[in-house]
């Protein structure tokens, strides 16, 4: 590669909102740099979403988007089901994983046609292990993107290398995770993410772990000041090839960028802003349990009744399909919507989360502890009320509540298992919800300390991506590293 040739990052996101959105933001951050070209490869429906989210950005013309066809019907999925969030049942997750990874041949062909400039590096989602094979074929480095924090990634690494899960028999027993800077305790299911498993996900998980180990480096949506010890330790564990470049949501500086980020919002920006402006500063609880929330209907009703009992203004985001249609019917038929209409805003579908969290009226965030939401809440300076569901979310809760002291636990201890949600039923009563909301939004010494701490972290987050900040500098170091790799090829 000649020194004057632009670097060409090929970004291949997994088709799920929680994976797609941060990788589009990372693409925007890279494309701002001189001498860097970025191409995103994704499926037809997701191309349309990305173009919409980028259409109001000055960077729209600098990011190339290549379309590939999602082979849903060949794997037994409904036609047009091109995002994990669209699955009617998470029992179809294996089918979706297989369909996503069947894109390898199309992606390879698209990369072969990239001549000026040819690809310099792949940024591949962890759920697309074929990206490691393509990196080897094209003899270029591959950076893996998990969408996790350094704390979670280091914890997963420790669990994998220590073999501690083999020594733990009970699923309910809490045990210390060895070799971490802080003393933290978990149950076996809470730390089983990205570990070898039995059952229908065995082969898929094995491929993901192998591709993770094969990757040249890791790109992480976090900032070093948030988790200093864990960023350092994880970088050591990955031979120095870890770049913390977040919070990537901060590339959406303008209100319109924030409102258009992600899927098409189910509420207009003006309507949302009007409601937020009508509330007192720091008075509103924002409630969103993620695009893959699988709580049973009984639990969702208890949550709603707890929010009502708290007498605090709130925004509650719920999904549109399946049991959430039943929830919407219950809200109307039970009189819930009528009773809370003066202080509650229910958004059915996608919400402009970064836009909402950045408003001065928001004083708390009830979250499932997905890393995007967790980091967006911290970046906005909003204390968190944590309700983890699955995946690495219990790890994120531990970071937020115990280590950062920026949040409060609602008290969930067991994972929600797909297909068995109704068996588990309601684990958190309306009274527990009410008490937790009152404590988070109250004026106790502990509540004030959480606000002080998260405000401090928010200031650090915003500085990280400023010129010369830690994440800004890490983007520079990443580009320099890939440039050296490209020049060493020839």
Swiss-Prot record:
Organism of derivation: Arabidopsis thaliana (Mouse-ear cress)
Top-level enzyme category: transferase
Name of the protein in its database record: UDP-glycosyltransferase 73C7
InterPro entries: UDP_glucos_trans, UDP_glycos_trans_CS
Ligand binding (UDP-alpha-D-glucose): 291, 351-353, 368-376, 390-393
Alphabetical UniProt keywords: Glycosyltransferase, Transferase
Family label: Belongs to the UDP-glycosyltransferase family.
EC assignment: 2.4.1.-
GO-annotated molecular function: UDP-glucosyltransferase activity
